[in-house]
Amino acid sequence: MKIIFNADDFGISPGAVYGILESYRRGVVKSTTLLANSPAFDLAVEVAKENPGLDIGAHLTLTFGYPLLQGLETLTDDNGRFRKNYTALESGLANVDMEEVERELTAQIEKILGAGITISHFDTHHSIEPLIYPVQHKLAEKYGVSIRRHSDVSDFGAIKTPDLFDTSFYADGVSFETIKKIVQEHIGTNDVVEVMTHPAYIDETLREISSYVEPRIKEVSILTSRELQAYLGQQEVEIISFRDL
């Protein structure tokens, strides 16, 4: 089997940038996805350029912070911010203009590309793929990239995806045992499994803007542990990135 350990939220805070960098340099993370509207975007770009082996994707968002474009009336609240989570976006989905979605996501992609970063894949913040999949699919075809597989989507066409997407390494599931369980479920197969991760060093920026904080430092510890790397080697698990699909 093959595993892609993808680190979400690249750029959400300086601590997240450095936590992901540590998980790449000393650990099993080979892919990460960058938030174009994040506070530490410039730092993330700098780190990405200094570490060309780190595979970069776009962490497309309609539920974090402010959009890059103005005048997106169906996607924002009265203060011009995106709705805060999946549920809030879903509840107003009937009134969402998908042309606005496409324009904003295109702007996010182009900002990353314009910073000199090559993008290999797309995923989304708060896993909103089922709500915007036709737009995401269209953009993936346009830019020639892979995307994260989602259980609510059955037809990916010619777009490359991992075979499975596993979210169990999150919150109370952040443990070495969780990864062992994932491996045991797929060992001996040719499956490519993406494991979602959120490693970060905790800083004030992260505390202010994210509800998922404390487990992130534990993720760094596990993803960089010799124990995990030895186990994956013993099980002959190949660690790859989205570039390798």
Swiss-Prot record:
Gene3D superfamilies per UniProt: Glycoside hydrolase/deacetylase (3.20.20.370)
Stretches of the chain forming a coiled coil according to its record: none
Binding residues annotated for Mg(2+), in chain numbering: H59, H125
GO molecular function, one term: deacetylase activity
GO terms for biological process, alphabetical: polysaccharide catabolic process
Transmembrane regions: none
Alphabetized UniProt keyword annotations: Carbohydrate metabolism, Hydrolase, Magnesium, Metal-binding
Cofactors: Mg(2+)
Keyword RNA-binding included in the entry's annotation: no
Keyword Hydrolase assigned: yes
Enzyme type, top EC level: hydrolase
Catalytic activity, EC: 3.5.1.-
Pfam families: YdjC
Membership in a protein family: Belongs to the YdjC deacetylase family.
Subunit structure, as described in the record: Homodimer.
Function field: Probably catalyzes the deacetylation of acetylated carbohydrates an important step in the degradation of oligosaccharides.
Protein name stated in the entry: Carbohydrate deacetylase 1
